[in-house]
Amino acid sequence: MTINNSNIQTDLPNSENCDLKNETLNIYFNEPIPIIKHCTNKDTPTNINNNNNNNNNNNNNNNINNNNNNNNNNNNNNNNNNNNNNNNNNNNNNNNINNNNNNNNINFSCNHILPQSALNSGICANSNPTIFLDKFKIIDLRPSGSGAKKGHGFPTIAPMEISHLINENEFSKFMKSFNRVFNYFFLLLFNVVFLIAGIIFPIFISRISILWAVVGSVGIFIIGGIFYCCINKYINGKRVGFISII
């Protein structure tokens, strides 16, 4: 599953009706989506605006209205559907889908997301979706099967529970904090190590020459500073002033 998003939100409302009417998810179908929100109002329909260009969709449990203004070539095998199809090959059952030929985006406007059973047999079973999200508040996957337990890792089958998702913003903040601590650690390490080396080295070399002791001490600081700057640049992608190291 591929998720591309710069602003993933995980504060999923815990209401009984899972009211997500004001939430929008832009989804591009390419791989299976193991993401479902289970709600108590199981009879509430899921209305999906599917904006795709010439897609082959195999769907179950949906009422489909396909409104693509291209060609009128239809190969349809439908059961219990309301279908207006143009230029699509569809196998559909009881889905509410509107295909409007707009940039392969699906806008979810619904009271709840399809349960796992509907996911396996419905819109996601054969169309292999990959998700590209602008807003994302649906991350509550329930385990299934006798051996599945809530919160116990990632089973090989899609049903699972993810109670918390570290989004890109949170991860970015974490990495900045980590890098800051990492930098301070290296700063302290190099300051202490090379300071000690700069003091001890002249003691041993002063027997030969005071000049060499001074050169050696300064050289140790310079080498340490260069090494630290290189390490920091590799990690953070930016340079650190040598004066900050000393």
Curated annotation (Swiss-Prot):
Kindly state which keywords UniProt assigns to this record, in alphabetical order: Membrane, Transmembrane, Transmembrane helix
Transmembrane annotation, as ranges: 185-205, 208-228
Which top-level group of life is the source organism from?
A: Eukaryota
Segments of this protein annotated with the region Disordered? 46-100
- Organism encoding this protein: Dictyostelium discoideum
**Where is it localised?**
Membrane
Where do Low complexity bias regions lie?
47-100
Where would you say this protein principally sits, based on its record? membrane
Which named protein is this?
Putative uncharacterized transmembrane protein DDB_G0292500
Q: Name one GO cellular component term.
A: membrane
Q: InterPro entries in the record, alphabetically? A: Golvesin-related_Golgi
Q: How does it sit in the membrane?
A: Multi-pass membrane protein
